[in-house]
Amino acid sequence: MPKLVIVESPTKARTIRNYLPKDYRVEASMGHVRDLPQSASDIPTELKGEKWSNLGVDVENNFAPLYIVPKDKKKIVKTLKDALKDADELILATDEDREGESISWHLLQLLQPRVPTKRMVFHEITQEAIQAALKNCRDVDQRLVHAQETRRILDRLVGYTLSPLLWKKIAWGLSAGRVQSVAVRLLVQRERARRAFRQGSYWDLKAQLTVEAGQFEAKLWTLAGQRLATGNDFDESTGQIIAGRQVCLLDQQEAEALRDRLQTQPWQVKSLEEKPTTRKPAPPFTTSTLQQESNRKLRLSARETMRVAQSLYERGFITYMRTDSVHLSQQAIEAARSCVEQMYGKNYLSPQPRQFTTKSKNAQEAHEAIRPAGNTFRLPQETGLSGAEFALYDLIWKRTIASQMAEARQTMLSVLLEVDNAEFRASGKRIDFPGFFRAYVEGSDDPDAALEDREILLPALKVGDRPTCQELAAIGHETQPPARYTEASLVKMLENEGIGRPSTYASIIGTIVDRGYAQLVSNTLTPTFTAFAVTALLEQHFPDLVDTSFSARMEQSLDDISNGEVDWLPYLSQFYRGDRGLEEQVKLRESEIDPAAARTVALEGLPAKVRIGRFGAYLEAEADGEPIKANLPKELTPADLDVQRVETLLRQKTEGPDQLGTHPETDEPIYLLTGAYGPYVQLGAATEEKPKPKRASLPKGMSLETISLEQAVGLLSLPRTLGEHPETGRRIQAGLGRFGPYVVCDLGGGEKDYRSLKADDDVLTIDLDRALELLAQPKKSRGRGKEPIREVGLHPDDQAPIQIFEGPYGLYLKHGKVNASLPEDEKPETISLETAVAALAAKAGQAKAKGGRRSTGTPKSGETKARTTKTTKKTTTRRTTSR
């Protein structure tokens, strides 16, 4: 009889099958086979009347979780049970972390095997690793199971207790989460700091100097013995120099006068300093640092990074990608050092094998950092990988190799020059030995730090040299507000604060964006007005749940539970049902929370209130005793909402939109408006005969304040015909779409060939020759390209394909015109047709319930003001069921 091996995914099954004897049968569980109920329909009929049933956790009975087998997993469970009937041994080979241990435990509970059962663990899928794992099987680790279950229960209690409160008090569909809400608050706090920021300005001088050996640059350092002010000397809340700072602050007039005075004065080298330094390579990747570097260097989201890493792991290219450890095994160190010696030579090897120590208290040193799999590392170009998979493997390979390379040696150079009563400083850097720089330089959110492998050479100088000043310029500077978080910097902050676990960061950030708490704009996470409202409510009424210190202590308690140092049941009881437990706090606070106040976003200094409505944020003010409401554009951020913007939106609402001018051909007025999706121009007013007048969005770089009448007429004429294709005779046009300006060639039969315009192209002036040049270039995918990641199957209703695509916010399912985010617990390689159909049906139902929404400010004939239509180790018995 065969031995049955169960893993999570078909990809992992295919890979591991290659390394097992022929009498082993490998099946995939497709992830979790049991979970807490996701909706009321999942709850067994006999339990629907229980007070706790909606939680899916029996808080009256030692927090016993109610586990159900989802509908889309019942067929899988049956397949596994049938396979087990023909097996003489069961081997559970799910991932080695808490989640994997939990899947194995649930499989045991469901399958109830009557044959010997083993737990097989490995951190890479290679022949050597699989053979070693087979010889060293163990039992399911109940501590890991309990740890995962406690986290799951705690997350459910927080989410399912607080979210309904948010629905009642702010808006339906909002959610709160143990880690999610803390992460959102971090974004909101940074945005508040940006609103409170006051800009300061300062001036300095920059000199271009020459000596016989060459040219160099120097900047003003001191004046009359006092250090010149820089941006770091300003108070962000006042825009003034921080009290007590003894610095020299120059304005434009003073800087220019100083420039004129110093230009004719002699310059002399006062001192030289050379300081040798060394730089050590960064440790190999953990889950967190991989997400950070991938975001900085590859512009991959945390979610996409983990998806690609999962694929690389399951196909045997890298070790397990969910780890807090920076430890490398002896075989990995030897493999890395062998690569270094072969590619760069012995002198680029570190003198001794370098081993890193994991700082995380709960990281397991038996686990390894993320590295290329195997006893020898495949070169990136020899893997056959492409796209994001190649880029991520290349990143992991380089980081691992660099960890065993010699330190980089460099010399920091500093030259002080004096001219009259001023001192200038020239700085340089000489790389004496590049060491690990040859392979890898760690990324940084600081652009200056990101250039640390670049030399800045100075000509040969000595004290007393008299350089000639070729040019002296006065340069103005303005201080900048605190930078918004990128995915990389948010992940780093969460890890530094001890909030959540790195393995969950990708899904947390994805959820924040999916739920509308943040927008991803130019790789930065910008919180929405809804995020402000929810954070304010939680800060006022449930401050512990969004406090970083409290969250870190909670995370530590959960780790202590997993280590057997803390009992899980008293902890849960105290958290949820204690005197100041969550259950009691929600009961007490619910009546105190005024919905009108909760829906109001507190932004100081504005002549209107910002409120959260059914369809998003809007302004509310009064004029002549009458209330005025105006929708806020979706791309408008809380930090950028100022008095001028508020007044413009309200004025458009009361007086109608501004009129730019009259169309030279139709004599119709051209209006300037702002809608939910940004600024646009409109030709004429809306009438019964013409309810939808011609509109055109403003392209990037154009604003309502600067657009000319000629430009507006041009935009309203789009798409414009440029001519015919010389080979096919088909029409070529230029236009403006959701992805920006483009040219398009009609191919006939409803098919069209599009190309985006380049930065230097203008949609209003591009000609046929340039359009043909663009159309001749290879077509690029925008992420929502024509090539799906996977086709799940045919929809049972219309036999149309259901496909998985990659979008700006992660992976999504597509069926016809309906798109739905890939469910959090599902993987693109393993999601079943039934689950995909259910997710699409739920999304279609939401869209139908919500209806549509039109933009603001459309003038109607005969009206003086615009109108807006808003359509816009546990001893308890777990409850289980397979219904």
UniProtKB/Swiss-Prot annotation:
Purpose of the protein: Releases the supercoiling and torsional tension of DNA, which is introduced during the DNA replication and transcription, by transiently cleaving and rejoining one strand of the DNA duplex. Introduces a single-strand break via transesterification at a target site in duplex DNA. The scissile phosphodiester is attacked by the catalytic tyrosine of the enzyme, resulting in the formation of a DNA-(5'-phosphotyrosyl)-enzyme intermediate and the expulsion of a 3'-OH DNA strand. The free DNA strand then undergoes passage around the unbroken strand, thus removing DNA supercoils.
Full protein name: DNA topoisomerase 1
PANTHER family: DNA TOPOISOMERASE (PTHR42785:SF1), DNA TOPOISOMERASE, TYPE IA, CORE (PTHR42785)
Key word Membrane present: no
Family recorded in the similarity comment: Belongs to the type IA topoisomerase family.
List of catalytic residues: 320
Species of origin: Synechococcus elongatus (strain ATCC 33912 / PCC 7942 / FACHB-805) (Anacystis nidulans R2)
Catalysed reaction, written as an equation: ATP-independent breakage of single-stranded DNA, followed by passage and rejoining
Stretches for region Disordered: 271-294, 842-883
Stored InterPro entries: Topo_IA, Topo_IA_2, Topo_IA_AS, Topo_IA_cen, Topo_IA_cen_sub1, Topo_IA_cen_sub2, Topo_IA_cen_sub3, Topo_IA_core_domain
Sequence segments annotated as region (Interaction with DNA): 175-180
Enzyme Commission numbers on file: 5.6.2.1
Keywords linked to the UniProt accession: DNA-binding, Isomerase, Magnesium, Metal-binding, Topoisomerase
Positions bound to Mg(2+): 8, 95
Biased composition (Basic residues): 867-883
